[in-house]
């Protein structure tokens, strides 16, 4: 395989978890509650997958228990947010910092007891820190290429579900079209709560792909991908399939940064900060599309045509 083929595969490997994270963030944006918690949940999901994989000796075991626990926890948080009429943005920030804190605590205590033999101790900071865990000895660790293909396929299936089913159409308009759904007798709050669980599933998939690709767990596993996913939502104009090219674009820039690190042309600190800088630029420069714009008018026509069809039936 040539240099170009190797580079393309490397970029696709990087883009797969980012596309999953962007799909989860877009799901919450559709419901009107932007998933500001994606960065922390991805990190916490990576920690849970690595921890249970070390305990049970199976990558699939760690992924299975995490994909059940994390979305369920987010769903309960969403239910509490709706019942208490709390601000979902502030709740999302609290979830983010809580997830980051639990990941750091678990990496320094739980891993030390569960898999001390697999630890690579980092003494560069404050004494001995059990924060870098090798998963090389776990069973049934599949090839990363399969995970990348499955991730893109799941994003495509999610896209088809949203645009091809009545529930998917309701879900897409549960944020901006909440009043229209209420007139029809559908409670938009249910879709808002479900969107948190959907974002949790996508975050677990992103964390699982990161663990699968790297083969280790570190507290910096997410590396800003949660924030980049939020930027992709607006860069892709809230279109599910546009999230994949946007994720590939950001992954290409990330790969370029890794290549430039070996040349010492650009300071390392600037390269590390580049994904965050690009996310900030996208947030500032990308305008939120209003309902009167062409894309929103098309979605509104689809919604009201669907409502008219249901009413006439």
Swiss-Prot record:
Role this protein plays: Probably part of the ABC transporter complex RfuABCD involved in riboflavin import. Probably responsible for the translocation of the substrate across the membrane.
Family designation: Belongs to the binding-protein-dependent transport system permease family.
UniProt main location, coarse: membrane
One Pfam family in the UniProt entry: BPD_transp_2
Quaternary context: The complex is probably composed of two ATP-binding proteins (RfuB), two transmembrane proteins (RfuC and RfuD) and a solute-binding protein (RfuA).
Keyword Membrane belongs to the record: yes
Protein's recorded name: Probable riboflavin import permease protein RfuD
């Amino acid at each position: 395989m040539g240099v170009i083929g190797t580079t393309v595969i490397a970029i696709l490997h990087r883009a797969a978890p980012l596309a999953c994270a962007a799909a989860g963030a877009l799901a919450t944006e559709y419901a009107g509650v932007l998933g500001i918690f994606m960065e922390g949940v991805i990190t916490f999901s990576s920690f849970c997958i690595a921890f249970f994989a070390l305990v049970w000796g199976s990558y699939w075991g760690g992924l299975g228990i995490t994909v059940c626990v994390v979305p369920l926890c987010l769903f309960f948080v969403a239910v509490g947010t709706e019942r208490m009429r709390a601000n979902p943005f502030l709740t999302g920030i609290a979830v983010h910092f809580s997830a980051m804190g639990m990941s750091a605590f678990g990496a320094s205590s739980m891993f030390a007891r569960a898999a001390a033999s697999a630890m690579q101790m980092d003494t560069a900071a404050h004494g001995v820190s059990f924060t870098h865990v090798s998963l090389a000895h776990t069973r049934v660790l599949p090839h990363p290429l399969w995970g990348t293909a499955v991730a893109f396929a799941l994003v495509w299936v999610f896209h088809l579900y949203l645009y091809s089913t009545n529930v998917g159409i309701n879900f897409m308009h549960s944020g901006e079209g909440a009043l229209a759904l209420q007139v029809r007798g559908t409670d938009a709050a249910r879709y808002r709560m479900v969107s948190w669980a959907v974002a949790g599933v996508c975050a677990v998939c992103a964390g699982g792909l990161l663990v699968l690709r790297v083969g280790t767990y570190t507290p910096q596993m997410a590396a800003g991908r949660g924030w980049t996913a939020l930027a992709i939502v607006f860069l892709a104009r809230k279109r599910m399939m546009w999230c994949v090219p946007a994720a590939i674009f950001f992954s290409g820039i990330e790969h370029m940064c890794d290549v430039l690190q070996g040349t010492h042309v650009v300071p390392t600190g600037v390269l590390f900060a580049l994904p965050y800088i690009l996310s900030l630029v996208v947030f500032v420069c990308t305008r939120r599309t209003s309902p009167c714009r062409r894309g929103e008018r098309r979605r509104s026509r689809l919604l009201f045509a669907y409502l008219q069809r249901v009413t006439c039936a």
